Regions:
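Solvent-exposed loop/turn and edge beta-strand elements of beta-rich ligand-binding domains
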Residues: 1-229
Length: 229
């Protein structure tokens, strides 16, 4: 049996770092000491960028990267291959032992993009190229639409204002009809299209801006987690 789990809330924001854990079983090989034996775990993410393996254990042993196993990442798909072939040993020494891989990934998903604002993580284990188990985990990001109108007395007569500018904050305070927010809570976005922005991975991301501009009076901001803005 194999499973993959994410820790924490599954309703996340773009740029958030998540921790995942893959649990599987070290396989037994029919020809125990064959030099052709291979054991790999392949993790294929959508809306995620896998960054690092923080730990890998087999049974009670903590393995060392590049000594006991290797990790390679496909630059085109982002898929990560963990190759444990070095650790197979002789006479099926580790067969049946529990394998636990803990690693981190950054959320890149946003509503309206190819991933649809949903991150997915699929892990499969392979013995000599044959799949021995697989599992997947998923979560999502949210979005809000902001609207700016003129101040006509009758609401039905109000017109949406093209070019209206907004700054978006989280963790603000409201008292006596006034809203205050800390500069540190200001959010930064990257423009995708007119009136459409996604949360920046950081304020230093290329073309990141704290000002979002409405088209025909509305602007959509994506990649948000749960909260009040």
């Amino acid at each position: 049996k194999q499973k993959i789990e994410a820790t924490g809330n599954k309703f996340v924001k773009r740029g958030e770092t998540l921790t995942f854990e893959i649990t599987t079983t070290f396989p037994a090989f029919e020809k125990a000491d064959s030099k052709d034996n291979v054991f790999t775990i392949v993790d294929t993410p959508t809306g995620l960028d896998i960054t690092d393996i923080t730990s890998l254990t087999v049974g009670n042993a903590a393995l060392t990267k590049d000594t006991d196993y290797t990790m390679t990442k496909d630059s085109a798909t982002g898929a990560v291959t963990i190759d444990l072939t070095k650790y197979i040993g002789k006479e099926n020494a580790h067969a049946g032992q529990t394998v636990v891989v803990t690693y981190t990934a950054i959320v890149t998903a946003a509503e309206g993009t190819a991933d649809g604002g949903i991150y997915k993580n699929t892990a499969n284990a392979y013995r000599n190229g044959t799949e021995t188990g697989g599992d997947n985990e998923e979560g999502w990001t949210g979005d809000i639409t902001l609207t700016k109108t003129d101040d006509a007395e009758n609401e039905k007569d109000r017109k949406q204002l093209n070019g209206a500018e907004f700054e978006v904050y989280k963790n603000f305070e409201e008292k006596d009809g006034k809203v205050t927010a800390n500069e540190a809570d200001k959010l930064y976005f990257v423009k995708e299209a007119d009136g459409v922005y996604k949360l920046a991975l950081s304020k230093d991301e290329t073309n990141a801006t704290s000002t979002v501009v409405a088209t025909n009076g509305t602007v959509q901001v994506k990649g948000l987690d749960e909260g009040t803005y």
